[in-house]
């Protein structure tokens, strides 16, 4: 019997991913207004980033300068093209387009910047993959409107979406609405809730009820944006985006199995609504059981049904094991009941390294939704050492990515998952979202910038640069 070797599709989208606030810098250039990430201080592993009410003198805000993609984008895109990128995921900084968020007219200088950047990508046949909201909400909307707790913000977001859809309708095909929207489930950790929504949930009398009200507004905004995109250009594809951390039961104890299932369901509600178009019974039962009053307007449920997303983008970095009783993790970490998994290793930041978990995640998501999937974040944050000759031998990053790509290929060629592409996170070094560090590096491209703010921003290729170039050229066959 002849066994045919299956490969990834020829149109598979290989590339890399970043977010505007982590790479662009130029926080007050070109008419840009302050966003919620512009008031996040630097931090470190074990030292949380501080959220300030405004930009304060004497505080260090690494996102203000980031790695100056705003001034280096042509140089950086040329390097992406050298690697052979088929696509590049980034976000449009909302406050470059609407500096306060509630203006009637957009900022033309901001629109022109993205025109130029997209043109530069398309010059090299690199498809832009664009997130509308990647932790970049206008600070003014937080201060004056209470952020997404206020229904008016739905209209402001939809106006922003319509403006950029119309402006870039012939330049950008792939969009996503909200980045890692489900990280609000970690509402006890202020950073996650704040960056996803502009809300510090712990300041509210009933944090979880507030979270669900915020989410309803975001779900409606996402659905209205999807409907607008289809009206403006039916060829555009709009996805939702999930932070996918599969939770394994620590044992076959039925209590552990049930606890893992319930914990995953708390995260799936975000994509259940955006992909299926309705609130699942398990969350409606929770609201009734706990006496939550989620305010909805007439027609909202119709909007959710009519504005389902075209595909599911997700990030994958790790798995966690959980148990019903005796877990060492806490609710603040977002993984209540978690315990160390003895079968996998961990990174310097404690993230469990589990390549097989990526295949598991792909199968779980595809079987649940039967929609195209897109791995829009996956990567290995590490301290990189620059040798005396200038080389950076990041074999650990190559090993991590190789193992994950191998499992990704199995999901496509064995399991039949419909996978659009793969964009490793931080393809160029950037400011870490969770810690505000430069030293937590992910990139194929090294940026000479350091946690104390020093460095000349020069770019250089790591060993992984040429490795990934060969991976793309061989469509994943040469690992």
Curated annotation (Swiss-Prot):
It catalyses: 6-phospho-beta-D-glucosyl-(1->4)-D-glucose + H2O = D-glucose 6-phosphate + D-glucose. GO terms for biological process: carbohydrate catabolic process. The active site is at residues 180, 377. Its EC number is 3.2.1.86. One of its GO terms (cellular component) is cytosol. GO terms for molecular function: 6-phospho-beta-glucosidase activity; beta-glucosidase activity; glucosidase activity. Induction: Constitutively expressed. It is an enzyme of class 3 (hydrolase). It holds the Pfam family Glyco_hydro_1. Keywords: Glycosidase, Hydrolase. Gene3D superfamilies: Glycosidases. Catalyzes the hydrolysis of phosphorylated beta-glucosides into glucose-6-phosphate (G-6-P) and aglycone. It has a high affinity for phosphorylated aromatic beta-glucosides (p-nitrophenyl-beta-glucoside, phenyl beta-glucoside, arbutin), with the exception of phosphorylated salicin, and a low affinity for phosphorylated beta-methyl-glucoside. Apparently, it has only a very limited role in the utilization of external beta-glucosides. Belongs to the glycosyl hydrolase 1 family. Homotetramer. This is 6-phospho-beta-glucosidase BglA.
